[in-house]
Regions:
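Short acidic, S/G/P-rich loop/turn micro-motifs used as interaction or catalytic elements
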Residues: 6-8, 49-55, 78-81
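Phosphate-binding/switch loop-helix module in NTP-utilizing enzymes
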Residues: 25-74
Length: 124
C-alpha cells in the first residue's frame, strides 16, 4: 500500500486502526513508490495517483515493467464527480469504481468484466 501524503498522519493511523489493519508479512505500507519493491507483491495499491504525482505515462511504464502485478489506483475526485487528471486514465484501467458516502459502485461506463452494481461499506 503506497499511502502518499497520508502516510503516518493521525487521520491515516486512525483509519487503519478503525479497520483493524496492521502491517504484517502480507501487507507493507510505505510513503512512496521508491520505498517499495513492487516485484515482491501481487497487488499494489496507489493512494492516490494524484498525491503520488503518477501520470498515465508513468503508469503504463509501471505496467510494462511489472506485468504480473495487479494495481489498484485511487484517484481524487472533483466536486462534479469526475476524477482528476487526464482522461487517458480511463483507457488504462479495467474497472472504475466510484465511492461516495460509504457506497462503492460501478456506473457501467467502464467495466471490462461486465455488469454494474453497488455495495455499501459500513465503517465501525
Amino acid at each position: 500500500y503506497v499511502a502518499g501524503e497520508q502516510f503516518g498522519t493521525p487521520v491515516f493511523i486512525k483509519f487503519l486502526n478503525r479497520l483493524g489493519i496492521k502491517p504484517h508479512s502480507n501487507l507493507t505500507i510505505v510513503r512512496n513508490l521508491s520505498a517499495l519493491n513492487i516485484q515482491n507483491f501481487d497487488v499494489v495499491v496507489l493512494d492516490s495517483k494524484d498525491s503520488l504525482n503518477i501520470t498515465d505515462v508513468d503508469f503504463k511504464e509501471m505496467q510494462a515493467k511489472y506485468p504480473k502485478q495487479s494495481f489498484v489506483i485511487l484517484s481524487q475526485g472533483t466536486k462534479s464527480g469526475n476524477f482528476t487528471g487526464s482522461e487517458k486514465w480511463r483507457n488504462l484501467v479495467d474497472t472504475m469504481i466510484y465511492c461516495e458516502n460509504l457506497v462503492a459502485y460501478t456506473s457501467g461506463d467502464k467495466n471490462r468484466w461486465g455488469g454494474k452494481g453497488s455495495m455499501r461499506v459500513d465503517a465501525q
